[in-house]
Amino acid sequence: MQQTKKLTHSDITIAVMSGPFLQRGEPALVSKWYRTKMALACGVDLVVELPYAFSTQKAETFANGAISILNALHVSEICFGSEDGQIENFYNTISVQKNEEETFNRLVKQFMNAGNSYAKATSEAFLHILSSEKNIDMSQPNNILGFQYIKAILMQNSSMQAQTIKRFASHYHDETFNDQHIASATSIRKQLFSENSSFTEIESFIPKATASLLASYKQNYGTLHNWEQYFSFFKYKLMTMSPEDLRHIYEIEEGLEHRILSKIQTSSSFHLFMEALKTKRYTWTRLQRACTHILTNTTKEEIYCANIEQHAPYIRLLGMSQKGQTYLSKNKKKIELPILTHTKTFDHPTLHIERKANSVYFSIMKEPLRTQLLKRDATHHPIRYDETTAKFL
């Protein structure tokens, strides 16, 4: 965050944040409201939500939704972390892909026909048409997402400029702590759910406010969220579904329904299920997203009605600093998308999916807490933060 501010000389900082489920197809550790507090305490001025219909998607759709929201908010610059760290290389890669589009598409098809996942086929196709010096490594997750951010900016004819910060020491998927002060999201998650884990083991890797809020969430609600806690719900749902039922679920394609229904029969945990389910053709992340759509009962028809090929249909405001509130007040008339401070009365197909996702997210809580949290989510107004006193209002 501090590096971003230093690089962009920004007046205000806006974060677009996923809701209950994330791009890798897994539940967020804590609710979006606690994560909003974390962001505000770390220097973000406006926190807005990326709807489920965009957030639990491949990089291209995820980026398209995020950029459309930032564009609507009249953001002048976007900054993202990447393994490459040189913004010129991203533009070079996009240019090469555009110039070699026919060859690129042919290679992707060729590698997919050989049994590779779309992500792997894309990465291999890039390796064949790009020289490594001035182009990015498209096998790296943050490079892929950054590439799609810039593509979305160009496709939406936005005047937004892009900047990138190089990720050091730790890669996104690293499962262990390889550095004294920098750790991957994956390694932090793994540590939090290990036996006899404590927050002291991750304190040197995350901001103090974040550690405090994580501990507070676990103390108040008795748990952090991961896939294993939803597995009994997930397995029950699958055991009551037919292949035809499953084919209606978003991202269930090419006979995947039969493999899912076969592997669930003998799986006693989500991790074991995923180990049995994964193939060369389907990445772990792609399968986790499909599982998330099964859990939330998100159908192809619902995603079609949400019209995700276009921009996000609204801006759900989750939190703001005093500076962020001033920015919104000054620019409100210029912002074309409706800004939602709660969702109780707003109606849209995208929001229907969102409500289901929230219901599922809180399903692991005991009653009456579960019902209270779900009701509160729809009526919850944006969290306000006074950055001069470092206090929530």
Swiss-Prot record:
Keywords: ATP-binding, Cytoplasm, Ligase, Nucleotide-binding, RNA-binding, tRNA processing, tRNA-binding. Its main location: cytoplasm. Belongs to the TmcAL family. PANTHER family: TRNA(MET) CYTIDINE ACETATE LIGASE. It is found in: Cytoplasm. It catalyses: cytidine(34) in elongator tRNA(Met) + acetate + ATP = N(4)-acetylcytidine(34) in elongator tRNA(Met) + AMP + diphosphate. It comes from the Bacteria. Pfam families: HIGH_NTase1 (PF05636). Catalyzes the formation of N(4)-acetylcytidine (ac(4)C) at the wobble position of elongator tRNA(Met), using acetate and ATP as substrates. First activates an acetate ion to form acetyladenylate (Ac-AMP) and then transfers the acetyl group to tRNA to form ac(4)C34. GO terms for molecular function: ATP binding; ligase activity, forming carbon-nitrogen bonds; tRNA binding. One of its GO terms (biological process) is tRNA modification. This is tRNA(Met) cytidine acetate ligase. InterPro entries: Rossmann-like_a/b/a_fold, tRNA(Met)_cyd_acetate_ligase. ATP binds at G81, N142, R167. One of its GO terms (cellular component) is cytoplasm. Its EC number is 6.3.4.-. It comes from Bacillus cereus (strain AH820). Signal peptide: none annotated.
